Amino acid sequence: ADRAHGGVRPVMPERAALVGAARVSIARGSKSFAAASTLFAAAVRERAWLLYAWCRACDDLVDGQDHGGERVAVTDAQRRVTRVRALSVAALAGAATGDPAFDALGVVAAETRMPPRYVHDLIDGFQLDADDWRPADEDDLYRYCYHVAGAVGCMMAIVMGVPPEEEATLDRACDLGLAFQLANIARG
C-alpha cells in the first residue's frame, strides 16, 4: 500500500490521457510555447507537451503558483523541492506517481532515453531558488542559468530527436537555454 495516496497505489494513466492533460497545460501556461509546438511533427509535439507539463508542474509546485499565475506565499520551499524530486525519481523509474505531469515525465523520459542527470540538474535549479541563492559572479550566473534553462534546452533537444550521446549538439542546445535565461534576466 502507498501511504501518500491513502493506502492505494496510483495507476499509470494511458499515454493519450497524459498527452491530453499536457496539451491543456501548455495551452494554459504558455501561448508562445503552444504555438511553437504546432511546428513539430505529431510525435515530437506530444513529447514537447509532456516535457512542458512536467517543467510547469515543478515550477508551480515550488513557487506556489498555478500555470505561472499569481504566487502564494511559500513557507515550505524545501519540502516542495523534496516532493518534486521524489515524484520525479519515481516517474523516471517508471512508477505511477498519482500526478499526470510527473507521469508525463516518466513517459517522455522512457520514449527518448532521457538521461536522468538533466532532470536532476533542473531540480537542482529549483533547489537554488528554494535556498534563496544568489550568484556572486559571472560563473555563478552561468551555473544558475544552466540549472534553470540549459538543462531544459538539453532535454528539449532530446525530445526533438537528438540522441543523448551527441554531446556536442546537446552543448549547443544548452547554450540556447542559457541565452534564453540570460535574456529573461536582462528583461526583468
Describe each PLM feature range:
Residues D2-A186:
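Acidic catalytic motifs of isoprenoid enzymes
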